[in-house]
Amino acid sequence: MKIFLDTANLEEIKKGVEWGIVDGVTTNPTLISKEGAEFKQRVKEICDLVKGPVSAEVVSLDYEGMVREARELAQLSEYVVIKIPMTPDGIRAVKTLSAEGIKTNVTLVFSPAQAILAAKAGATYVSPFIGRMDDLSNDGMRMLGEIVEIYDNYGFETEIIAASIRHPMHVVEAALMGVDIVTMPFAVLEKLFKHPMTDLGIERFMNDWKKYLENLKK
């Protein structure tokens, strides 16, 4: 399973890359606007850091606008993946871009039916939103599992990115299902390191080592 960071913050990305566990990044206009950065420049900076897939989202909603934006963004770096919303015009744009060899990520997916359309259009990635489904009192993980099963049934090449991840259990459950990729906020990535028994174990080892050094001085 690959791990992507869902952020536009360069410091967070640097840390993830230094840890050696981040394979890519997903962004959107909201994340980049929070950083106060110029959109295309920030996308280029992220690509220079991560050296892996970096999803950058179009803001047009019509077919022609999406394709035009996508072609421009694709020129920024070989690592750029174009995020396209799950709409009829979006799926049409994905079909066109896929034929041109431009990688795409269909976003705002909330049902297996939508995921089927993304795969049929030749999307490189599809991003079902788990946490947002949970917010609607629906089972986001069940939706994700159904998408995994459908893709396995038909051998679709589109990779599944579990998105809208809220906590470590989302990550674990997605991994158990065999999801290709999980994209998560930096705060969730940090939580993956944590377990109270680990902290207690480290504290105990350090105390024992301190006592050992004190005994050597006697």
Curated annotation (Swiss-Prot):
Q: Which GO terms describe its biological process?
A: carbohydrate metabolic process; pentose-phosphate shunt
* Active site residues according to the UniProt entry: 83 (schiff-base intermediate with substrate)
Q: Which GO terms describe its molecular function?
A: aldehyde-lyase activity; transaldolase activity
Coiled coil (residue ranges) = none
Q: Chief subcellular site?
A: cytoplasm
Q: Which GO terms describe its cellular component?
A: cytoplasm
The EC category is transferase
Statement: the UniProt record of this protein carries the keyword Magnesium: no
Query: What keywords does the record list, in alphabetical order?
Result: Cytoplasm, Pentose shunt, Schiff base, Transferase
Q: Which HAMAP family match?
A: Transaldolase_3b
Family per record: Belongs to the transaldolase family. Type 3B subfamily.
Q: Kindly provide the name given to this protein in its UniProt entry.
A: Probable transaldolase
| GN (gene name) | tal
